Amino acid sequence: MSPQTETKASVGFKAGVKDYKLTYYTPDYETKDTDILAAFRVTPQPGVPPEEAGAAVAAESSTGTWTTVWTDGLTSLDRYKGRCYHIEVVVGEENQYIAYVAYPLDLFEEGSVTNMFTSIVGNVFGFKALRALRLEDLRIPPSYSKTFQGPPHGIQVERDKLNKYGRPLLGCTIKPKLGLSAKNYGRAVYECLRGGLDFTKDDENVNSQPFMRWRDRFLFCAEAIYKAQAETGEIKGHYLNATAGTCEEMIKRAVFARELGVPIVMHDYLTGGFTANTSLAHYCRDNGLLLHIHRAMHAVIDRQKNHGMHFRVLAKALRMSGGDHIHAGTVVGKLEGEREMTLGFVDLLRDDYIEKDRSRGIFFTQDWVSMPGVIPVASGGIHVWHMPALTEIFGDDSVLQFGGGTLGHPWGNAPGAVANRVALEACVQARNEGRDLAREGNDIIREASKWSPELAAACEVWKEITFDFDPVDKPDIEAK
């Protein structure tokens, strides 16, 4: 009898409730190369042993329910059940444990992030035996990742499309994010692109509101792109947000963007949903559009240390679902992000093979095989004085996005773009000459500002602006 059809009917059925750990806690289990592995931060309720809590997570996110059922005998639970195979204490935290769970690959539909998350982070997060639960990391085996298309194009194809190499790309989110007419919005796009930026961007909540309908915005932004390209000789783009109330409307907007000949569209992948995002990513690959991803709503899921899901999991899911850019924090700006933890998931977005490194929050070695990489976008409260640190932290394969740091320039939008482009070129040149950006960054910016009045004005405006808050997202003590 094949494992798929093997049953346990001959064993007999015994009704009642039994501890999860009797079936789902298997410390002797040797994980398979095809298993999806998960690391959960578990906070059990008082009186619940960690082994029972870890087993409950494995059970409720795979084949288990609260009581034994007749139909258990109609399948092979040993083939399909999740297994909690290891538990470790979190040093420095009261009543917290890392529970490692292995899931057989047959539990998941091929090419569906939606189905994967419905199982792994579904009802189990409301389980009463747990005070809190957080998914820290996933190991996606190549046998599963190869069922996904992944990013529409990836880093190298994007650089070839833009004909831009050897430096980070520069962007700007148009502000105010809401309230501008389409024509005034397009004017701001033109001024920023003409000044030297590679991209401008719709904010995440710009969709199709009464003050600016999407079709009008697309038309004026396309006009701005073509005008700026003609004047600068560079390929330009604007992230046209195609996010909509239905998948059909979203694809309609992407089709219109393609007909206009613009290079890139945008999607809010968490509020829009993984099914919609994957559909849009497939359309973008088939039609030559780059896809920029915004992570609006992520902090609702990932901000708390003991409950929810770490952003590195959302980043892996996005790489599988599809996107060419994704916002990833700045380390130095106004948004949450500790350096090593941020670089941990940045590597998971960009690199082919990432080694386990608990000091950076990476619980498992991840092999993406041939899946294209995603460009991280640093955005949020950054300005010209941050340019050396951003260039040093994120490297060439990144987008550095200055919204207020462009549009807040005292001389206007185009001079703000000029200031950022001059600062970036100065940092890249200094790095290529062997200078230490971390140590000499301020001197590099000051030297460049002597030859650029636009940069000098920006330096004066933002010389004392800092965001000095202690990040929540830090590695555990034992992982250092």
From Swiss-Prot:
PROSITE patterns to which the protein is assigned, alphabetical: RUBISCO_LARGE
Residues marked Transition state stabilizer (site): K334
Note accompanying the cofactor annotation: Binds 1 Mg(2+) ion per subunit.
GO molecular-function terms, A-Z: magnesium ion binding; monooxygenase activity; ribulose-bisphosphate carboxylase activity
Keywords annotated in UniProt: Acetylation, Calvin cycle, Carbon dioxide fixation, Chloroplast, Disulfide bond, Lyase, Magnesium, Metal-binding, Methylation, Monooxygenase, Oxidoreductase, Photorespiration, Photosynthesis, Plastid
Names of required cofactors: Mg(2+)
Gene3D superfamilies: Ribulose bisphosphate carboxylase, large subunit, C-terminal domain, RuBisCO large subunit, N-terminal domain
GO terms (BP aspect): photorespiration; reductive pentose-phosphate cycle
Reaction catalysis annotation: 2 (2R)-3-phosphoglycerate + 2 H(+) = D-ribulose 1,5-bisphosphate + CO2 + H2O; D-ribulose 1,5-bisphosphate + O2 = 2-phosphoglycolate + (2R)-3-phosphoglycerate + 2 H(+)
PTM notes: The disulfide bond which can form in the large chain dimeric partners within the hexadecamer appears to be associated with oxidative stress and protein turnover.
Taxonomic superkingdom: Eukaryota
Locations listed in the record: Plastid, Chloroplast
Residue positions binding substrate: N123, T173, K177, R295, H327, S379
Prosegment residue ranges: 1-2
Residues with N-acetylproline modification: P3
Modified residues (N6,N6,N6-trimethyllysine): K14
Record: residues binding Mg(2+): K201, D203, E204
Subunit structure: Heterohexadecamer of 8 large chains and 8 small chains; disulfide-linked. The disulfide link is formed within the large subunit homodimers.
UniProt-listed PANTHER family: RIBULOSE BISPHOSPHATE CARBOXYLASE, RIBULOSE BISPHOSPHATE CARBOXYLASE LARGE CHAIN
Its job: RuBisCO catalyzes two reactions: the carboxylation of D-ribulose 1,5-bisphosphate, the primary event in carbon dioxide fixation, as well as the oxidative fragmentation of the pentose substrate in the photorespiration process. Both reactions occur simultaneously and in competition at the same active site.
Further comment: The basic functional RuBisCO is composed of a large chain homodimer in a 'head-to-tail' conformation. In form I RuBisCO this homodimer is arranged in a barrel-like tetramer with the small subunits forming a tetrameric 'cap' on each end of the 'barrel'.
Protein name: Ribulose bisphosphate carboxylase large chain
Lineage of origin: Eukaryota, Viridiplantae, Streptophyta, Embryophyta, Tracheophyta
The encoding gene: rbcL
